[in-house]
UniProtKB/Swiss-Prot annotation:
Gene: Dgkg
Name listed for the protein in its UniProt record: Diacylglycerol kinase gamma
A Gene Ontology BP annotation from the UniProt entry: phosphatidic acid biosynthetic process
Catalytic activity: a 1,2-diacyl-sn-glycerol + ATP = a 1,2-diacyl-sn-glycero-3-phosphate + ADP + H(+); 1,2-didecanoyl-sn-glycerol + ATP = 1,2-didecanoyl-sn-glycero-3-phosphate + ADP + H(+); 1,2-di-(9Z-octadecenoyl)-sn-glycerol + ATP = 1,2-di-(9Z-octadecenoyl)-sn-glycero-3-phosphate + ADP + H(+); 1-octadecanoyl-2-(9Z,12Z)-octadecadienoyl-sn-glycerol + ATP = 1-octadecanoyl-2-(9Z,12Z-octadecadienoyl)-sn-glycero-3-phosphate + ADP + H(+)
Record: residues binding Ca(2+) 1: 185, 187, 189, 196
The protein's annotated pathway: Lipid metabolism; glycerolipid metabolism
Regulation: The activity is calcium-dependent. Requires phosphatidylserine for maximal activity.
Length: 788
């Protein structure tokens, strides 16, 4: 390992690589299978060093796109090293290992562990670090082709690359440990020697540094882990010894991506490594957490905080999230956690100093904080979020012999005695079911998930990656007056509404939205905004308490292709919540979608998205792929054909809500003196009558808008033009096409061969409205002047 020549990625490049990994549908195991017979990489030997060209092929197979040249070159140089010299400690593949001298191994074990965990002076994660001089000579930055053409060009060992990338993937820690073991067990004898373990630990340390861990804490922990893994002291580590050692090293589990879903309610902490912005003390040893990176481990459920070195000690357990009593009526007691409460005491209202870690404590459930001498009643009522929170005394067990799953959606073996839980909420409360899509908004969803785990009971917060909305809906199925908070984009909201339909509720629960990411047209219409920007979640929860209800129309989308045509792309949804369009805007959206899948790092902000949309709109203006759309479609509104022969259109949009493309209103505003609320649902196509038609998301009517071209679409999107051309307002729409055309529903585009499309009303879903926007100073001035 001493001959290794590391070139660190910058933090921006590491984030860029993670985004590519998140967008890819492939796993490392899938790509390794390509080296087998019949695979796309079958002509290469994965056990031998690979060149830059093979490295690019491997990364393309894994990420499904070509990496940008600077990132690809820098990543290759980060793994490049001189060919390894075979030593007795690292036997050749297929060779039988001679039995080592156990005493020599034990005496040298600590030294080897020190070497594996030693500081890597050539891998500091600085943004400006350049390749070493030796590598620059072999592979100049400006000429990546020299990486392959030079006779002494650097190479990489595929094992190192695979181990590194596998640490970035989601999955169970025990699966990652087993995967890395089998990856480095080159002779397949079921044993790892010290050199092989050193290589794995080296990759772990590099990933940890990119994640802003403080290596001064992690190195001695990994050193101790290596020393203790070899339980029988025979000089080698078996698979079971490797997994047992890794699964009992909590900082390593956090690095591997600890799955905390199974620890809810059983008193186990769910740890995350954290950087503290203010002085913080260890709850075990009382010493301050030091360091410039992420200094310590913090439980996402109760905020119990410890050093990495203290986490393996005998520490207090986490809070219980449910009750052991089989009947309601149990009195809820405070669940105290000491220290790290730099706020005012809720009794004496005096400030609590950060160093008073022993003299003050706070309750996990109600958030009340007291000096020890100021504590009042021991009874906890849930605090300011008591209308939403499920206290542990409200989740009671019901034992029974049942084949299937628990009431919270988890699966049990046949005939196994499982513990079911029922929710008995406090009178007058409205328990909140929180469903979080961790993939929404980049990493924003993951942070939101952790915050809600602390603000509410972890039992009522569900990760949509673990079985979707169904487990949470099943857990709350018989709970009266509960509400749902959907955390994600419009697609996540539609997914949750579909699952609510299938859950057969007697009364559908109302749904509020915490929008993550960009776009979020439905959330905008419901006044929840275009995207969460880091405000107080407690404030949002208080706003939900006062939210009025509105019924959202939902529509069937039936696409019937003609029998004689070939199958096109798969239709994304058969339910429409927001809008459907065909023609120029769908063509732009399709190009936008394809480019975002290929280069996700270029679409990480609303401003960048608008610029890309403008570029695609400009190119579509010259291409005019949907010119003379009226020659290729027939439009019927409530069974009446709309004459398009005298209208030169390149696109048609069917609207349910007054927002599209992140806030664009294609229907336009209707002046108040012209607005007419229609009592009948008869189709309206007369241009004069359409000027008076008001758009409403709960009127069981659709609005049909025509678009003249990409230039007009761009003007509407950028605010230079108010709206498109109103064609109709009706309760059902039928469209027939005679050629391949771009289409989209709720922001998901596809290419559709000739077909018949029918849009009819499905049902209405109760949604919660956000608070009305506060009037600005200038609007108040205008109002006061008008009164004068």
């Amino acid at each position: 390992m001493s001959e290794e020549q590391w070139v660190s990625l910058s933090s921006e490049e590491f984030d860029q690589l993670q985004k590519y990994s998140e967008y890819s549908s492939k796993k490392i195991k899938d790509v390794l299978a390509e080296f087998n017979e019949g695979g796309s990489l079958r002509q290469y030997d994965p056990h031998k060093p690979i060149s830059y060209d093979v490295f690019k092929l491997f990364m393309r197979a894994y990420l499904e796109v070509d990496l940008p040249q600077p990132l690809s070159t820098h990543l290759f140089l980060a793994f490049s090293q001189k060919p390894r010299q075979e030593t007795p400690d690292h036997p050749k593949e297929g060779a039988s290992s001679s039995e080592p001298n156990v005493s020599d191994y034990n005496s040298d074990n600590a030294a080897k562990a020190d070497e594996a965990c030693a500081p890597d002076t050539e891998s500091k994660t600085t943004k400006t670090q350049a390749p070493s001089k030796e590598l620059e000579a072999a592979a100049p930055w400006e000429d990546p082709g020299a990486l392959a053409s030079s006779s002494d060009a650097p190479v990489v060992y595929l094992k190192d690359v695979v181990c590194y990338l596998s640490l970035m993937e989601t999955g169970r820690p025990q699966d990652k440990l087993e995967f890395m073991f089998r990856l480095y067990d080159s002779d397949e004898n079921g044993l790892l020697d010290q050199a092989e373990m050193d290589q794995i630990v080296s990759q772990m340390l590099h990933v940890a540094q990119y994640l802003e861990w403080d290596p001064t804490e992690l190195r001695p922990i990994l050193k101790e882990m290596l020393q203790g893994m070899d339980y029988d002291k025979d000089g080698f580590v078996s698979l079971q010894e490797w997994i047992n050692g890794g699964m009992t090293t909590i900082p390593l589990l956090v690095l591997l991506g600890m799955d905390d879903s199974g620890s809810k309610g059983d008193g186990r902490h769910a740890w995350t490594l954290k950087h503290f912005k203010k002085p913080t003390y260890c709850n075990f040893c009382r010493a301050m957490l030091m360091g410039v990176g992420k200094q310590g481990l913090c439980c996402i459920y109760c905020k119990y905080t410890v050093h990495q070195r203290c986490v393996s000690k005998t520490i207090h357990g986490c809070v219980k999230t449910n009750s052991k009593a089989k009947r309601s009526g149990e009195v809820m007691q405070h669940a105290w956690v000491e220290g790290n409460s730099s706020v005012k005491c809720d009794r004496c209202h005096k400030s609590i100093k950060c160093y008073q870690s022993v003299t003050a404590r706070h309750c996990v459930w109600c958030r009340m904080t007291f000096h020890r001498k100021c504590e009042l009643s021991t009874v906890c009522d849930g605090g300011e979020l008591k209308d939403h929170i499920l206290l542990p005394t409200s989740i009671c067990p019901v034992s029974g012999d049942r084949q299937g799953g628990k009431s919270d959606g988890s699966v049990a073996a046949k005939g196994e005695l499982v513990t079911q839980y029922k929710i008995i909420p406090s009178p007058g409360t409205h328990p909140l079911l929180v469903l979080v899509n961790p993939k929404s908004g980049g990493r924003q969803g993951e942070r939101i998930l952790r915050k809600f785990h602390y603000l509410l009971n972890p039992e009522q917060v569900f990760n949509l990656d673990n079985g979707g909305p169904t487990p949470g809906l099943n857990f709350f199925h018989d709970t009266p007056d509960f509400r749902v908070l959907a955390c994600g984009g419009d697609g996540t909201v539609g997914w949750i509404l579909d699952c609510i339909d299938k859950a057969n509720f007697t009364k559908h629960p109302p749904v509020a939205v915490l929008p993550l990411g960009t776009g979020n047209d439905l959330a905008r219409c419901l006044r929840w905004g275009g995207g969460y920007e880091g405000g107080s979640l407690t404030k949002i929860l208080k706003e939900i308490e006062q939210s009025p209800l509105v019924m959202l129309d939902r529509w069937y989308l039936e696409v019937m292709p003609r029998e004689e045509v070939e199958n096109g792309d798969q239709v994304p949804y058969n339910i429409m919540n927001n809008y459907f369009s065909i023609g120029v805007d769908a063509s732009i959206a399709h190009r936008f979608h394809m480019m975002r899948e290929k280069h996700p790092e270029k679409f990480n902000s609303r401003m960048k998205n608008k610029l890309w949309y403008f570029e695609f709109g400009t190119s579509e203006t010259f291409a005019a792929t949907c010119k003379k759309l009226h020659d290729h479609i027939e439009l019927e509104c409530d069974g009446v054909e709309v004459d398009l022969s005298n209208i030169f259109l390149e696109g048609i949009a069917i609207l349910n809500i007054p927002s599209m493309y992140g806030g664009t209103n294609l229907w336009g505003e209707t002046k108040k003196n012209r607005a007419v609320i229609r009592e009948s649902r008869k189709s309206v196509t007369d241009p004069k009558e359409l000027k008076c038609c008001v758009q409403d998301l709960s009127d069981q009517l659709l609005e049909v808008v025509g678009l003249e071209g990409a230039m007009e679409m761009g003007q509407i999107y950028t605010g230079l033009k108010s709206a498109g051309r109103r064609l109709a307002q009706c309760s059902s729409v039928t469209i027939r096409t005679n050629k391949l055309l771009p289409m989209q529903v709720d922001g998901e585009p596809w290419m559709q061969p000739q077909c018949t499309i029918k849009i009819t009303h499905k049902n209405q879903a109760p949604m919660m409205m956000g608070p009305p926007q506060k009037s600005s100073f200038f609007s108040l001035r205008r109002k006061s002047r008008s009164k004068d």
